[in-house]
A protein has these predicted regions:
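Signature for phosphate-centric chemistry
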Residues: 86-101
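A short acidic (Asp/Glu
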Residues: 69-73, 160-165
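Active-site-proximal alpha-helix that buttresses catalytic centers in soluble enzyme cores
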Residues: 2-86, 104-135, 187-189
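Glycine-rich phosphate-binding loop signature in dinucleotide/nucleotide-binding domains
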Residues: 52-54, 139-147
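Domain-level recognition of soluble alpha/beta enzyme cores
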Residues: 26, 169-194
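Short active-site-adjacent structural elements
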Residues: 16-17, 158-161
């Protein structure tokens, strides 16, 4: 029996250095630069992920550059569809005075306060959840008819997509964490395509 398949991968290693210490304001400036940065040069896509991407029927990417470059590097072609709805959920750094820590630490603290409801004017957790539900519907529609869909996205929002897809009945058949080039592979029994007018 044929299955619809969605493979959701995190982008590769970005070019912007994380080897800095920043206060909360500087982290927000760093994040803005990160959002427009591309991939670090001369990196290899894991063999399994590259094989899946090359065999996919449709390649989809977030609208951010690092995701688009990752999609092309993995699949060998430009994305068929690019969605702003797949961008990473925001990271509003909490006001912690002059304390300076690494971007990774800021990311952790920012994600915690965001998760529990503090967004400081950025997209809220509730709104991002709705976005994830909407995007999971779009991805599911693309996969109908036994297609293999490769999606190049971002760490936390990929997790949110996992929850949305599971609510729809998708099964996560394999996954390997949340690091760069990590992935989650989802499958469901093939949904038939419905032609207009029938």
């Amino acid at each position: 029996m044929t299955n619809d398949i969605i493979i959701i991968a995190r982008h590769g290693k970005p070019e912007l250095s994380r080897k800095v210490r920043l206060n909360w304001k500087e982290y927000r400036e760093w994040w803005l630069k990160y959002q427009i940065s591309g991939l670090k040069k001369e990196q290899k896509v894991p063999k399994r992920l590259k094989k899946w991407a090359e065999k996919s029927d449709i390649v989809i990417s977030s609208s951010l550059l690092r995701a688009q470059e990752s999609a092309t590097l993995a699949s060998g072609r430009d994305p068929d569809f690019i969605y702003e709805g797949l961008i990473e959920a925001p990271l509003p750094s909490p006001y912690l005075g002059s304390i300076k820590i690494r971007p990774k630490s800021w990311g952790t603290w920012s994600r915690i306060v965001w998760y529990f409801g503090w967004s400081d004017g950025m997209e809220s957790h509730k709104s991002a959840r709705i976005r994830a539900d909407n995007m999971s519907n779009i991805l599911a529609d693309h996969s109908k008819g036994g297609k293999i869909i490769y999606v190049s996205g971002h760490g936390w929002f990929n997790r949110m997509l996992k929850g949305s897809l599971k609510k729809q009945g998708w099964k996560c058949k394999s996954q390997n964490g949340d690091l760069h080039w990590s992935y989650r592979r989802f499958e469901r029994q093939t949904q038939k395509l419905v032609k207009n007018g029938n």
